[in-house]
């Protein structure tokens, strides 16, 4: 896709359907679990949440996985500092069995959490479906589905309210487009899972730029770009030869980022940087 874009002097978003969105809201992902007491984590998470909000991100996502009771303490603490109207998401990375996930999910309902991500094992379609039926918080997932066939099962079994395809995990843009179309054909909003380098972020920004709104009345559902705020990632800062800063855009544009019109994905890897990771047999 990148070669085709460069060959035809066309940005990726034009190749995959054209611009549907001038700007994409960005949410900050942080608040990772550490080997600390719950009280220490509460203090750390609250400070990190304040920082993410102060940088103009439109929403934020936090980790859980200490156990149901301790996790709800963490979420309540973060909700307290960001306010009741700020969009907050919770990512469990399939930390729970079904009963524990139901307990946590009912607690999240009371805290007006936007989504509960990967609450149970990705293979547990029955568990996902039961959670979706019994709690009000949106169930999000799909980053661990690596083919359109797996996604078809996830959707057919009515497991999720929000689809989170991971373009890198799916093997690339072509398979992603099939999965995205499948989700949209079943009226499931697509909010991509984003993890990795500047290449991944740039590709996702193009894909979301070309993503049509989901039906939903006067104010249809909008997607968001996930951005890791946890630490400096040299594969974001040092990999591209071009100036590429999502943080600067978020700060300057009130939480939004826009794609460039550079041909292809808009990122040219710095070959000298990549040589540091070269493996010689």
Question: For each predicted feature, which ranges?
Answer:
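Active-site-adjacent beta->alpha loops and helix N-cap segments on the catalytic face
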Residues: 15, 66-82, 97-101, 119-132, ...
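A cross-domain feature marking catalytic cores of carbohydrate-active enzymes
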Residues: 28-30, 62-64, 90-94, 118-120, ...
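Shared catalytic-loop signature of beta/alpha-barrel
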Residues: 106, 112, 123-140, 145-256
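N-terminal capping/lid subdomain adjacent to the active-site entrance of alpha/beta enzymes
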Residues: 1-88, 93-102, 106-110, 236-281
């Amino acid at each position: 896709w990148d070669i085709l874009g460069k060959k035809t002097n066309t940005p990726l978003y034009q190749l995959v359907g054209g611009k549907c969105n001038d700007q994409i809201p960005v949410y900050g992902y942080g608040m990772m679990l550490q080997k600390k007491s719950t009280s220490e984590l509460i203090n750390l998470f609250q400070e990190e949440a304040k920082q993410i909000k102060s940088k103009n991100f439109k929403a934020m996502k936090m980790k859980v996985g200490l156990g149901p009771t301790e996790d709800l303490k963490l979420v309540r603490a973060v909700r307290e500092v960001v306010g009741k109207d700020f969009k907050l998401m919770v990512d469990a990375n399939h930390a729970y069995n079904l009963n524990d996930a139901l307990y946590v999910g009912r607690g999240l309902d009371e805290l007006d959490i936007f989504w509960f991500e990967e609450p149970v094992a990705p293979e547990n379609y029955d568990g996902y479906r039961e959670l979706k039926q019994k709690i009000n918080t949106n169930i999000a997932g799909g980053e661990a589905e690596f083919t359109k066939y797996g996604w078809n099962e996830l959707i057919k079994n009515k497991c999720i309210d929000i689809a989170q395809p991971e373009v890198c995990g799916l093997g690339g843009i072509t398979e992603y487009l099939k999965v995205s179309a499948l989700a949209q054909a079943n009226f499931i909003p697509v909010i991509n899972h984003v993890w990795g380098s500047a290449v991944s972020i740039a590709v996702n920004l193009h894909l979301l730029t070309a993503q049509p709104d989901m039906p939903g009345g006067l104010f249809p559902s909008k997607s968001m770009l996930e951005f890791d705020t946890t630490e400096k990632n040299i594969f974001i800062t040092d990999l591209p030869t071009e100036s590429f800063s999502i943080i600067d855009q978020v700060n300057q544009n009130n939480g939004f980022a826009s794609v460039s019109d550079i041909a292809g994905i808009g990122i040219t890897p710095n070959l000298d940087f990549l040589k540091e990771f070269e493996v010689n047999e």
